Amino acid sequence: MNSFTLLLVVVFLTLTFEFSNGWHDAANSIATVVSTRVLTPFRAVLWAAFWNFIAAFVFGTAVAKTIGKGMVHIEIVNERVLLAGLLGAISWNTITLILGLPTSSSHALMGGYGGAAVAHAGFKALVLGGWIKPVLFIFLSPIIGFLVAMLVTILTSWIVRGYRPLKVDRWFRRLQLVSAAAYSLGHGTNDAQKGMGIITAALVAGGMLKSYDVPYWVIICCHLAMGGGTMAGGWRIIKTMGQRITKLTPFGGFSAEAAGALTLMGTAHFGIPVSTTHTITGAIVGVGASRRLSAVRWGVTRRIVFAWVLTIPGAALLGAVLFQAGRSLVK
């Protein structure tokens, strides 16, 4: 298989990954707005997909640069590494989707890419310093989402304390459309940029680009793929995210989405690739805990956290195994 054919395969698989990312993470964008019955599932996925795409015209490419050249030394990257890394990430996403686990597509990509790079060139392939912030934010992003959600919940509770519950419910049913749009913007910019990073790395490795600058067509294609995946949805995970962790009202849904949006947009601004899944889960737990700790179904939360911990090493193992298996096929 020649280099150009491999490049085309990598681009196709990256867009497939972005589609699966939107499909897998659709639940994060719309679980709260569906579970509170503000929108039907069909309208919710259209709403989220639209704002996923609009994010292409709002934010930069700092996260793409972190993924593409900040975690693996770009000079050792070739099409085989990228191909195996993508297949590892897609395989992990598929396994966790079948199991109904809301794991992180972002961390699956990081793990698959890193595992394939190590299989190719050893641990010297990794930019060790580039892994510090993403790994640190595995733990920090849900904590930040949790704290911001508690703060938003407490603040908005104080603002509406003198109004009748039915009136407050009507207000927040409308406001949840805004918060869901903001969250989908944050989801779109943070997650679509990861695919941009991989495609741009492939273009550099294949000699199509002289410097690491993300082409505009790559930005548009990644956002279109993610929007399409979001429209396809991931309904089993929606149930876990929307109701099994804690029961949400429109007021709580607004607080969770607003907290998630603020966290995702802030980290995207600083080029930190975080997990939308981790962020919104932390925010939903924060909403429940602001009422009382017993409102959170901690058994479900522990199962989700366990899946998070396994994502990077699990996807890395798949990426490494697939790289070794593919040596004879793509010489």
Predicted regions and their residues:
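Multi-pass alpha-helical transmembrane bundle typical of ion/small-solute transporters
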Residues: 1-331
